[in-house]
């Protein structure tokens, strides 16, 4: 069956949900990994995309996402502060560009950003573009088309809005907003001309079937940059005692995400420090071809130089010429 699916993918077809379930439950794992590797190289070549983020506003979020240290609903040790200045953001962006990183995102806690905050962010992005040629991304919650247009007009080319998990599982993790609201933001971002980056977190108690559901969901909304975070349970949050994924579960998930999303950048993200170096290498071999590098929000990330060296050792070229979404549905 694996060979049949590989041939179908190469000829423009797709796996079915039922086939993905069978691969997860009964396929020889090494054969699955090898197939995902070949599909990665066939559709994506040897380019490896890098980006970095800065937590431009931290804590006091009114939303109740059960995994998140930023929520005011939970007693965590997260540092709380308002928006960083344009100067600080630009200095961080320039530093990351000097490390060879191609993209830089301002990430802010909260359900949304006020118009005043959007104007402050616009100033930050203008300052960044004056200082460096790094590509600008933003992750500021649920935004209207008007606010997204302001960001786009000030240099933001990519908007990040994680769908987080499978539609069947999301309501059990968050009650203060819906995935449909996230989809509305993604559609608005595309209407103003932005690319979209959207992924989520695995290991929050979802089943493998729900991970497959999630991968197909992202495919259905034409996402071509998919951060795959691994839950790092944070004391004080409802998920603090969630048991970790096994290494095999993680690698199988990466392989299935690759077969379901053959043309996407699958991106190392938060929580990956839990993985051994050998598993990180294996994940890159199987299908990871991008990374959020540096320190990631409230969990431990990975230093840029180390990530780039790892990608090169795994046969990739670290490049800034990795645009996605040549065309997409509005």
From Swiss-Prot:
Pathway: Cofactor biosynthesis; biotin biosynthesis; biotin from 7,8-diaminononanoate: step 2/2. Its EC number is 2.8.1.6. InterPro entries: Aldolase_TIM, BATS_dom, Biotin_synth/BioAB, Biotin_synthase, Elp3/MiaA/NifB-like_rSAM, rSAM. SUPFAM superfamilies: Radical SAM enzymes. It is an enzyme of class 2 (transferase). [2Fe-2S] cluster binds at residues 105, 137, 197, 267. One of its GO terms (biological process) is biotin biosynthetic process. One of its GO terms (molecular function) is iron ion binding. Residues 43-272 form the Radical SAM core domain. It comes from the Bacteria. HAMAP family: BioB. Homodimer. This is Biotin synthase.
């Amino acid at each position: 069956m694996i060979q049949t699916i590989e041939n179908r993918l190469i000829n423009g077809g797709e796996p079915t949900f039922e086939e993905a379930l069978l691969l997860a439950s009964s396929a020889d794992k090494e054969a699955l990994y090898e197939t995902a590797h070949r599909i990665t190289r066939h559709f994506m070549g040897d380019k490896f995309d890098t980006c970095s983020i800065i937590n431009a506003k931290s804590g006091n979020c009114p939303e109740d996402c059960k995994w998140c240290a930023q929520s005011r609903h939970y007693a965590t040790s997260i540092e709380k502060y308002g928006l960083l200045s344009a100067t600080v953001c630009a200095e961080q962006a320039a530093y990351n560009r000097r490390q060879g990183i191609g993209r830089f995102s301002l990430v802010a806690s909260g359900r949304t950003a006020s118009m005043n905050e959007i104007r402050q962010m616009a100033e930050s992005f203008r300052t960044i573009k004056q200082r460096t040629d790094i590509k600008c991304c933003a992750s500021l919650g649920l935004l209207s088309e008007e606010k997204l247009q302001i960001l786009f007009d000030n240099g933001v080319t990519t908007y990040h809005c994680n769908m987080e998990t499978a539609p069947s599982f999301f309501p059990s993790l968050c009650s203060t907003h819906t995935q449909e609201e996230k989809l509305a933001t993604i559609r608005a971002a595309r209407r103003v001309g932005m690319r979209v980056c959207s992924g989520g977190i695995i290991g929050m108690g979802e089943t493998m079937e729900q991970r497959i559901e999630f991968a197909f969901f992202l495919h259905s909304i034409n996402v071509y940059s998919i951060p795959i975070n691994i839950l790092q349970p944070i004391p004080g949050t409802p998920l603090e005692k969630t048991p970790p994924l096994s290494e095999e579960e993680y690698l199988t998930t990466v392989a299935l995400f690759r077969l379901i999303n053959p043309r996407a950048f699958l991106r190392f993200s938060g929580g990956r420090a839990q993985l051994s170096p050998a598993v990180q290498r294996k994940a890159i071999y199987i299908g990871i071809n991008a990374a959020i590098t540096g320190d990631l929000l409230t969990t431990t990330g990975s230093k840029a130089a180390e990530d780039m060296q790892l990608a090169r050792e795994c046969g990739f070229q670290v490049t800034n010429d990795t645009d996605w979404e040549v065309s997409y549905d509005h």
